[in-house]
């Protein structure tokens, strides 16, 4: 999903130098980040037009989460007609990924986060995720922050909890994820 015109041209030259060469490509347009690293989704979504005869195998099973998140996320992504249509399902029909939404007054933002953390069993892992690296700004007024290398943590209710952007969290897992600034503001989700 991150293929650019430059990368395409490089692969094209390699293939022209060795005509029997085959490509084995893996990607997921649902995970693409618009124009990340110069990517051009046309190269991915119209792969056969650029690379020739193609066999496509869709991976439609997720091992990361269950319903209702499978349905909600798939429905959201497939609203974009340019996305490759897929029928995503969880590897286990018994696996559930519960979603909870909390309304809060801006003045109670940090207290609301503290209450959420306090309600999570201590043996469960937690991530604080923001869209932007500054989404943790208000937390720094109430909670101790710790920087270890390039990782940031907040001590909330005696627990050290990592803060990441959604982009940096790609591929990571936690038992509980708290999305910060999940609103309709200028910098919200």
Question: Language-model features: where?
Answer:
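Conserved Walker B
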Residues: 1-3, 29-30, 169, 182
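Conserved RecA-like helicase ATPase core segment
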Residues: 5-96
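Generic beta-sheet signal
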Residues: 23, 124-130, 161, 177
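Short beta-strand/turn micro-motifs composed of small residues
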Residues: 27, 130, 181
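Short catalytic/ligand-binding loop motif for oxyanion handling, primarily in non-cytosolic enzymes
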Residues: 32-35, 65-68, 135-138, 172-173, ...
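Helicase P-loop NTPase motor core
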Residues: 53-55, 61-155, 169
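Conserved helicase C-terminal RecA-like lobe
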Residues: 122-125, 169-189
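Conserved two-lobed SF2 helicase motor
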Residues: 159-168, 176
């Amino acid at each position: 999903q991150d293929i650019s015109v430059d990368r395409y041209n490089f692969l094209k030259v390699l293939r022209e130098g060795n005509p029997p060469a085959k490509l084995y490509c893996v990607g997921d347009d649902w995970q693409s980040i618009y124009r990340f690293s110069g990517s051009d989704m046309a190269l991915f979504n119209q792969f056969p037009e650029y690379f020739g005869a193609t066999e496509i195998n869709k991976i439609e099973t997720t091992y990361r989460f269950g319903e209702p998140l499978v349905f909600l996320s798939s429905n959201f992504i497939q609203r974009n007609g340019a996305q490759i249509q897929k029928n995503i399902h969880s590897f286990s029909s018994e696996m559930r990924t519960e979603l909870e939404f909390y309304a809060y007054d801006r003045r109670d933002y940090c207290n609301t986060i503290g209450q959420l953390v306090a309600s999570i069993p201590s043996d469960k892992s937690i991530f604080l995720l923001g869209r932007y690296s500054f989404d943790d700004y208000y937390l720094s007024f109430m909670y101790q922050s710790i920087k270890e290398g390039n990782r940031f943590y907040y001590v909330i209710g005696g627990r050290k909890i990592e803060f990441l952007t959604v982009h940096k969290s790609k591929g990571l897992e936690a038992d509980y994820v708290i999305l910060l600034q999940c609103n309709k503001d200028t910098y919200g989700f």
